[in-house]
């Protein structure tokens, strides 16, 4: 009987180790959703190079699920923002505001892009805010790259 109990204990401990996830202990609690999410700073270009640009903005803390995404819809036609870039962020329930940063890759040098920004929960629920259409132009191709 003691051997059976020992085997059961070892098996249970092994299964527990194999199926445990240390991230479960780090998940922030869900917080009340903000009545209205507003962009309070930006959006603005944090960095722009030939092939990539990072767009940053700050909103009040949207609340809800701790896992969110900053979302940028962009394109070369202000009436057809057909491309989307997203970047994950974990909300801090103790902060009144949230800074979103989204990286746009594979851009064309010397090209004007138009964009809007917003945010959503990880499961896809939109936070209900969207910026006006803004624009930026990527730097032209460098001399070094042309050689």
Q: Predicted regions: what is each one?
A:
Residues 1-9:
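Bacterial N-terminal signal peptides that target proteins for export
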Residues 9-16:
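Bacterial N-terminal signal peptides
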Residues 16-24:
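C-terminal segment of classical bacterial N-terminal signal peptides
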Residues 26-147:
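Short, surface-exposed linear motifs at loops/turns and structural transition points
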């Amino acid at each position: 009987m003691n051997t059976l109990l020992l085997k059961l204990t070892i098996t249970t401990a092994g299964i527990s180790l194999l199926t445990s996830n240390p991230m479960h202990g780090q998940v922030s609690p869900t917080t009340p959703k903000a009545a209205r999410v507003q962009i309070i700073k930006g959006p603005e270009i944090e960095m722009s190079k030939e092939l990539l640009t990072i767009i940053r903005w700050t909103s009040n803390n949207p609340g809800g699920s701790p896992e969110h995404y900053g979302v940028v819809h962009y394109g070369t036609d202000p009436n057809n923002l057909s491309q989307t870039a997203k970047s994950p962020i974990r909300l801090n329930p103790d902060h009144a505001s949230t800074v979103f940063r989204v990286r746009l890759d594979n851009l064309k040098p010397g090209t004007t892009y138009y964009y809007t920004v917003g945010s959503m929960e990880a499961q896809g629920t939109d936070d209900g805010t969207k910026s006006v259409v803004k624009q930026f132009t990527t730097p032209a191709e460098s001399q070094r790259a042309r050689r």
